[in-house]
Structures are given as C-alpha cells and as structure tokens.
C-alpha cells in the first residue's frame, strides 16, 4: 500500500520536521519513503509544506499532488490544500489556530487542538508533535513507537526537558483520537 501525505503550515511550526519524522519512521519500519520539502518565504512565519510518500514498494516520484492525508497546521494551508486531498482521504487540522471547519464532505476530518494541548504539555512549539501523534494513532501509516524513535534520532543532543515535552505532546495527540 502506498500513502501520500502533505504537511503544511507556517514556517517555524516544525512542518519540515513532521515530514522528516514520518519518513524516518517509515524507514525504521523497513518501508520505502520519499520526503520533499517546499518553502515559501524562507523565514519564520512564511509558508512551509512538505510531502512524504510511504510505500511497500519502490517509489517512482517524490511529488504529491493528491495526498491521501493532509496534516494542516494553519488557516492559509487549509485554504490551499483542502481541495487536493483524495476523496476518502484524511484531513487533520489544527483547530487551535483554524477558525473554520473543513468544507468537504467526501473526506475524513479530524479536528486536533494541537496548540492547546501543546501548551498544556509546556510549549506551543510541540503542536506539530501533537498532530503527528493523532495522525499515527488514527491512520496508522507509521506506528507511534516508530515516530518516537525517529524523534530521538532527529532531536539527538537536545536537552532532556525538550525531548520529554515533544514525546509527551506526541503521546497526547494519540490519546486525543484513541
């Protein structure tokens, strides 16, 4: 099975890290994967998105035009990518920052209070981890344990408090939808 994922939001929300973690988790599970970041203004607050493909077989192209799953962290990204998700696909959106509902009725919609939960954990910077935890639990493209292992690799060298907040945020996201 091949699954195409789009992560999108503002620069500084950890969008690229989300994609890296999904891709690394998939590799850790012995699957084929591609990771393709795209940036708007190259600064905090500009737009950022990335696409990830996870497959049991080799992947011909890293381009994702019609994702099966969209992990959306802000309103402009929902406006831009809502229409691109395949019918029957999934849209996870950060309802802490997005004040409208998903308009489509032909996709599964998961509302994630990512920033609210991240602040409860200790830092709004972990909102991306909340979203990843919800995605892992609900869709199962990669296992939560694989994402946590990838997190340890990607954030190696960070202080233990930051690591623990990110782990806890991911687990809380999974609990939210579990």
Q: What would you call each of these model-derived segments?
A:
Residues 1-178:
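Active-site cofactor/cluster-binding pocket
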